[in-house]
């Protein structure tokens, strides 16, 4: 067809015709509706990526209940049955520590204050540092006993020291939980011993963990202690007692900074783990794991996600 036009139109006219034809084809391609369709598709794909739900991923935690949170923003990166209400064991102590540090920041107490151990506090079973009735320790030492060795007796002693009784302290714990939006939590005691009506969820544990580490980063001075001695001072004299951190993740995961373990026959093995990964602060919570080894493994897997 081009030979026909060249022959009958003349060379100059043919060149003009060819130019106009080429230009027409070029602009028809540029302004084709195909571009609009492609853009719409791209926007939809981008939107889907941005709104992707935390559970729509190939990774699955082995723990029955788990959650991974980015601490600075509270963004949930992963969750699995995170609102299931279960006994948390000594992970309860995160709230206890939060109230202790709140009291410190309000100048209600100081780290050098002397705490006297009551009969009730000394009678606590489970994990303890064997405080005796009438024994005195500083607030600083009591925090170490709670954060490192998960001492029930130290928890009750601090609760009584700040608010006069464990019951009054627990009421403050529940009020604080409500203020934080912890919808699946109710505390009966300050140390985490199994009790009817004492429960929380993986999501709520992450919420109170975030509040503690964001508002009171000094907690890491205690949760990163691996081993340390305290001195018992009683009527019988002085004796050394060794504290050993219950959170083995500290020695098994690079960047681990805390936070709190828990285990009872009902709660099984729980852990709220904090760590720094590539300058990002993370909180990983697992509940109802089958063993202490499994909870560490499960938290490490979450933190690696």
Put a short name on every predicted segment.
Residues 14-33:
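Sec-dependent N-terminal signal peptides of Gram-positive bacterial secreted proteins and lipoproteins
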């Amino acid at each position: 067809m081009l030979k026909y036009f060249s022959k009958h139109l003349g060379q100059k006219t043919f060149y003009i015709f060819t130019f106009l034809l080429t230009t027409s084809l070029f602009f028809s391609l540029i302004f084709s509706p195909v571009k609009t369709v492609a853009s719409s598709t791209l926007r939809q794909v981008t939107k889907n990526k941005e709104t992707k739900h935390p559970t729509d991923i190939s990774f699955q935690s082995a723990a029955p209940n788990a959650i991974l949170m980015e601490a600075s923003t509270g963004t949930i990166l992963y969750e699995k049955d995170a609102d299931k209400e279960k006994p948390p064991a000594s992970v309860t102590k995160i709230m206890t520590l939060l109230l202790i540090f709140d009291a410190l920041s309000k100048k209600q107490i100081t780290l050098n204050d002397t705490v006297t151990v009551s009969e009730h506090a000394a009678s606590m079973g489970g994990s303890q540092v064997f405080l005796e009735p009438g024994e005195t320790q500083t607030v600083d030492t009591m925090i170490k006993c709670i954060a490192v060795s998960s001492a029930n007796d130290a928890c009750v002693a601090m609760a009584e020291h700040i608010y006069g009784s464990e019951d009054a302290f627990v009421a403050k714990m529940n009020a604080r939980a409500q203020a934080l939006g912890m919808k699946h939590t109710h505390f009966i005691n300050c140390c985490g011993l199994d009790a009817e009506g004492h429960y929380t969820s993986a999501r709520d544990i992450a919420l109170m963990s975030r509040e503690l580490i964001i508002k009171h980063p000094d907690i890491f001075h205690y949760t990163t202690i691996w081993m340390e001695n305290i001195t018992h001072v009683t009527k019988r004299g002085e004796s050394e007692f060794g504290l050993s951190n219950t959170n083995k993740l500290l020695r098994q995961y690079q960047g681990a900074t805390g936070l709190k373990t828990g285990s009872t026959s009902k709660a099984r093995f729980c852990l709220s783990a904090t760590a720094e990964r590539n300058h990002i602060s993370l909180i990983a919570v697992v509940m109802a794991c089958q063993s202490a080894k499994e909870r560490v493994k499960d938290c490490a897997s979450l933190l690696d996600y």
